[in-house]
Amino acid sequence: MEKAFDRRSILGICVGSAAGAALLTSTAPVYAAPVAFKADLKGSSEVPANTTTGTGSVTASYDPSTKTLTWSGTYSGTTGPVTAAHFHGPAEPGKNAGVAVWISTKGEPFSSPFSGKATLTDAQAADLMAGQWYANLHTAANPGGELRGQLTKS
């Protein structure tokens, strides 16, 4: 009788350990790799398009584990100083949307090159991952936007 009890105890310990390991595995956080994005900034991408000769680019990386978007970029040839810069969304190419995240600091001078970071909400992250964000640089001559580029996964 004592041997049967020992076998059942051992079997119970094994089953319990396996169930516990499965539970730990299923609840452990999943850390996805950062996702890279890029955007080519040009006046022809604005809505409506403009005839600026300015150009620029933005590269960005979104880290799902921290919900942090980090970016850097450059621009040149704008009609004047950039008065504000933002990420807008959600919007597909050819559509406009409101400001999602400021690239520049409101009320501060903005120049090239630039960089920054922000923590996104779940909704913002979903829109970014779905290709629904664009970068937009504004000037006095083009207050609605002089240079625009849709963020695409790179």
What is each of the regions a protein language model found here?
Residues 2-85, 89-154:
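Metal-centered catalytic cores of metalloenzymes
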